[in-house]
Amino acid sequence: MKQNNAACPIGCRYCVITQVGYRRCQWEQKFLIGMNKTVTILNPPPDKNDMNVMDSFYNFPLELLEADRVGFNAISDPFWQKYGPELDWFLEHVAPIVKVAACVTKMPVSESLMRVLATIKNFQLNVSITGLEIIENSTTRSRLKTLELAKKYGVKAFVIIHPYIAGMSDLSFLPKLKAIGYDCVDVKGLRYDPSMADWMPQAARKFYEGTEGKEVLPEDGWRKKIEVAGLQLKSLRQWTEENQQTEPRLSRNEAEKRVRKLLQYANITSSDKNAAVIQAAIERRL
């Protein structure tokens, strides 16, 4: 069932960027900057042979990101070796001017890289574990190992079950998560696309058919499994805010001005209304 995807080595069959039509069009139109209510995301170009778009990444006006929370590479996995130079550049040039520098990954993170991440005090590592190995080129075991390394080296890390697919996601990893020192998780739903019927069993499809474009999180017992494992639910946004630096800050006037300029580059990738995303981007900088 696994697929190869030139855009990402994980090749998730449910990928909202490659498998959900309207989201794919969004990212094709504007790939460099994504914005939601939690973070701004800086994406390196999918085609690294196009020098014009590579210049747009390396010459991006970084003052527009100052004092924000900024994630690296949401259109692929940030730790894919292909983007190693761009990750290094992000950690060197973006991390020092923001409140939070973040990555969301499903890939294994090596011990040597974890040691580097540990030196960046405002870095946050978000590990997505789904229990969906059959449709991902990654394993639950490797992601638990990454989380163990984060504990070993003191890297702030958080777990997201993203997406949870009713009738498919295997949550048997939850007790192990608790055992290695994590106390809370976030759970996100699935944005269904009819093309997913090719690999999704009917027992799961019944929860999603007719919901195209909406994030759906069925109540099928996953909350109880989290409770039994001794874990608590917490949103990624709340955890990020609780663990962010308080500096740097901008004045409200300056924050509003920079966000207006940032919107010229940005693709708003949120189910929230645009006005709410823009207001959140301003407030993050204060």
Regions inferred by a protein language model and the residue ranges of each:
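Conserved AdoMet/S-adenosylmethionine-binding subsite of the radical SAM
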Residues: 54-225
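Canonical Radical SAM [4Fe-4S] cluster-binding loop centered on the CxxxCxxC motif
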Residues: 1-49
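Selective for proline/serine-rich intrinsically disordered segments
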Residues: 42-44, 59, 161, 246
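Auxiliary Fe-S-binding modules of radical SAM enzymes
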Residues: 171-286
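Intrinsic disorder/low-complexity detector
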Residues: 1, 13, 72, 283-285
